[in-house]
């Protein structure tokens, strides 16, 4: 994060300790005048938390000018990256599935601010910004989206299967809800190894009715696994509104015997506070559910215009009233931590960096055709298989 600190010039002359690396994108934006102060201040969340069989955390969230400026930068970078991905897809440089996250940036950024790299994160197929929040490289992201060798999954994963093992980011998963049991498995490993870490296990409201979620939740509660199940409720499972798919859309109560919180997922400070609270709960008591009330601006995927099952007025209303980036912009301006022009300059620098990352990604070669056969089997594993006739077949895989 030392690179992130360089981004912002001190306004008040306060000597600041470096912010931990876990909460920042690897950007090098430098904007004069934006406050880098670490003087603490308290801001109240936009709305109260709703809770299920647990006392909610306080609405007052401790933050600093530096943190707010970093939030603004990181969310703006994510937004610009997703808009760029939209253009690359329409130019046919990105093929196949592509699910964009713009509008939901506060969830990824707020969650990262409450965790360390020892904590694990696993999510579904809308995973670009979760990867970036874990410190993922912009050029590696775009290279992966374009199927290039320099991608974070060597060009073989594409949009839905980003991965960053050194940051404990276990990727996106294309099957709805399939990642939830895997996340509980990560938490099982953390408990088995006696690690002081938790797993944030993300899924959408469209996956909230999947059977494997309840099976995994039961086992997690039974064994008191250190897992935080995060339902990113953007209110539409593909094109189906939540009220058409769920008898009870209060997803934070779905755990029955598992505590839950409903959080304004468009308020990055509320997300940070809730995730910090949930992490401590998971370490001490086992699983907890966080329902993030959020919203995606794009359609479900690139083939979905996003306007056949909801009105354009609805989308515009959310942008105007709840946009996560604009909320932080208003806080920075209201507390005189930055001027309008300084924030615009930061956004211009971000756009340049995204463009530079795309140009670098385009220079990366396509994977060699032989890559089709790598990482499929383990070499020399001495597989033993049994047929119905009980005869043993031994073989060595290529």
UniProtKB/Swiss-Prot annotation:
Q: Which organism is it from?
A: Oryza sativa subsp. japonica
**Major location, coarse class?**
mitochondrion
List the record's Gene Ontology CC terms alphabetically.
mitochondrial matrix
- The source's domain of life comes to Eukaryota
**Cofactor(s) required, per the database record:** thiamine diphosphate; Mg(2+)
Which residues are involved in binding thiamine diphosphate?
125-126, 174, 176, 205-207, 234, 300
- Relate the assembly described in the record: Tetramer of 2 alpha and 2 beta subunits.
Which InterPro entries does the UniProt record give?
DH_E1 (IPR001017), PDH_E1_Alpha_Subunit (IPR050642), Pyrv_DH_E1_asu_subgrp-y (IPR017597), THDP-binding (IPR029061)
Q: Name one GO molecular function term.
A: pyruvate dehydrogenase (acetyl-transferring) activity
Which key words tag this protein in UniProt?
Answer: Magnesium, Metal-binding, Mitochondrion, Oxidoreductase, Phosphoprotein, Pyruvate, Thiamine pyrophosphate, Transit peptide
One biological process term from GO is: pyruvate decarboxylation to acetyl-CoA
**Role description:** The pyruvate dehydrogenase complex catalyzes the overall conversion of pyruvate to acetyl-CoA and CO(2). It contains multiple copies of three enzymatic components: pyruvate dehydrogenase (E1), dihydrolipoamide acetyltransferase (E2) and lipoamide dehydrogenase (E3).
Residues bound to pyruvate are 99, 125-126, 174, 176, 205-207, 234, 236
In short, the EC number is: 1.2.4.1
- Span of the transit peptide along the chain: 1-33
What this protein is called in its record is Pyruvate dehydrogenase E1 component subunit alpha-2, mitochondrial
Cell compartments where the protein resides: Mitochondrion matrix
Q: Which reaction does it catalyse?
A: N(6)-[(R)-lipoyl]-L-lysyl-[protein] + pyruvate + H(+) = N(6)-[(R)-S(8)-acetyldihydrolipoyl]-L-lysyl-[protein] + CO2
């Amino acid at each position: 994060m030392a690179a992130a600190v360089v981004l912002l010039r001190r306004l008040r002359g306060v000597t600041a300790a470096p912010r931990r690396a876990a909460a920042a994108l690897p950007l090098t934006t430098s904007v004069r005048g934006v406050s880098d102060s670490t003087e603490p201040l308290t801001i109240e969340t936009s709305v109260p938390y709703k809770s299920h069989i647990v006392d909610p955390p306080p609405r007052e969230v401790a933050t600093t000018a530096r943190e707010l400026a970093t939030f603004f930068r990181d969310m703006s970078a994510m937004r610009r990256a997703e808009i760029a991905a939209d253009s690359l897809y329409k130019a046919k440089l990105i093929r196949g599935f592509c699910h964009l996250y713009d509008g939901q940036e506060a969830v990824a950024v707020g969650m990262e601010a409450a965790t360390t790299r020892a904590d694990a994160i696993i999510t579904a197929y809308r995973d670009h910004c979760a990867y970036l929040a874990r410190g993922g490289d912009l050029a590696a992201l775009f290279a992966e989206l374009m199927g290039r060798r320099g991608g974070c999954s060597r060009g073989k994963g594409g949009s839905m299967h980003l991965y960053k093992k050194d940051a404990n980011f276990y990727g996106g998963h294309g099957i709805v809800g399939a990642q939830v049991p895997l996340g509980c498995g990560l938490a099982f490993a953390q408990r088995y190894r006696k690690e002081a870490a938790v797993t944030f296990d993300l899924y959408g409201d469209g996956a909230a009715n999947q059977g494997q979620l309840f099976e995994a939740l039961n086992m997690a509660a039974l064994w008191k696994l250190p897992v935080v199940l995060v339902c990113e409720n953007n209110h539409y499972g593909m094109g189906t509104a939540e009220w058409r798919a769920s008898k009870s859309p209060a997803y934070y109560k779905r755990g029955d015997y598992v505590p839950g919180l409903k959080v304004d997922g468009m308020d990055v400070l509320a997300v940070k506070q809730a995730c910090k609270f949930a992490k401590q709960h998971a370490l001490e008591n086992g699983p907890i559910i966080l329902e993030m009330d959020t919203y995606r601006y794009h359609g479900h995927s690139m083939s979905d215009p996003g306007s056949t099952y909801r009105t354009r007025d609805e989308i515009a209303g959310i942008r105007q009233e709840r946009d996560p980036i604009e909320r932080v912009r208003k806080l920075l301006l209201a507390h005189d931590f930055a001027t309008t022009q300084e924030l615009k300059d930061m956004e211009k620098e971000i756009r340049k960096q995204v463009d530079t990352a795309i140009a670098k990604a385009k220079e990366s070669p396509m994977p060699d055709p032989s890559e089709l056969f790598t990482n499929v089997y383990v070499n020399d594993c001495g597989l033993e298989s049994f047929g119905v006739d009980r005869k043993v077949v031994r073989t060595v895989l290529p």
